[in-house]
Each structure stands twice: as C-alpha cells, then as structure tokens.
C-alpha cells in the first residue's frame, strides 16, 4: 500500500479519529437508552402497583398484594408483616425490633448486619404500620431499588391509612 500524497495519509488519520469518536458516542448513547428504558419500565411497574392498590381492601389483601408487587419489582422473595393493633407482637424478633424502632435493620444495615433478611419499616412520619422483610440470601438491594421500594412503601401506608379510616366509620 503506497500513498503518493501526504494529504491522503492525514485524511485517513482524521477519518479514523472521527470514526473512533462516533463509535464511543454511539456506545454511550446505547447505554443511556438502556438506562432510560429500564427506568421507564420500573416507573410503569410502580404506576401499575399504585393502580392495583386502589382495588385492595382489608389487611390480608393489602399484605398479599404488597408482597406480590414488591416481589415483581425486585425479583426477590418478600414478606410483609402488618399490625392491625399495637398489642400484637411479631413472632420474628428482628421484625419486632424494626417495628418498635422504626428503623431498617438486618442485611447490610448498621443493626444486625449479619442476618440474611433486610427489615424495612412500613411507616409515615408519625406511625409505623408494619415491616417488609426481603430475603437477602446472596444479594442486596441496590440504592436505586431502595428508592423504588420506598415509593411502594409510601403507597402501602396510604392504603393502610385508607383502610383504617374506613374501619372507623
């Protein structure tokens, strides 16, 4: 391969550099598109969950629907423990501690970090209604998943408050 003009060599070099830049930008764009699609999918799931809560009544239905929804959202095994009255006690001591302290505990948290379960209270500013237990055998909730779970928890608290108001009538 022999070039007669140095301008051809410079042109080829410029084309190679431009091709590398375009390729890098395309890879970044593809990653951003994948991320946007994933966020859209999760937002859609959260909206679906919220719509499903509109048709739920009774603590047993709330518990069952919450477990199914969180399991679909995270892809992990989830148990929801609700207290209909303050005198009840959970049989699980860590769940009881989480409920009483209104703090997360278990896997990856400051309190009881060696446990395989992650215990997250279902609460609003004034009151705790129950505990969500994630089975964290061989995995952890990522920060972005915690945000989605917190969104669902706020929906659960609204449904529980609605249920309690309807019982008081």
Report residues per predicted region.
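Membrane-proximal helical linkers
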Residues: 24-65, 168-169
């Amino acid at each position: 391969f022999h070039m007669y003009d140095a301008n051809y060599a410079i042109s080829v070099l410029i084309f190679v550099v431009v091709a590398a830049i375009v390729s890098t930008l395309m890879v970044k764009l593809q990653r951003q598109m994948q991320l946007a699609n994933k966020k859209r999918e999760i937002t859609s799931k959260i909206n679906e969950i919220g719509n499903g809560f509109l048709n739920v009544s009774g603590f047993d239905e709330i518990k069952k629907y919450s477990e199914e929804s969180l399991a679909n959202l995270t892809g992990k095994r989830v148990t929801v423990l609700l207290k209909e009255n303050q005198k009840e006690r959970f049989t699980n001591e860590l769940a009881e501690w989480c409920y009483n302290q209104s703090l997360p505990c278990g896997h990856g948290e400051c309190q009881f970090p060696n446990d395989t379960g992650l215990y997250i209270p279902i609460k609003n500013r004034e009151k705790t209604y129950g505990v969500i237990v994630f089975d964290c055998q061989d995995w952890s909730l990522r920060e972005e998943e915690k945000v989605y779970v917190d969104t669902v928890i706020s929906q659960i608290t609204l449904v529980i408050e609605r249920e309690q108001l309807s019982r008081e009538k």
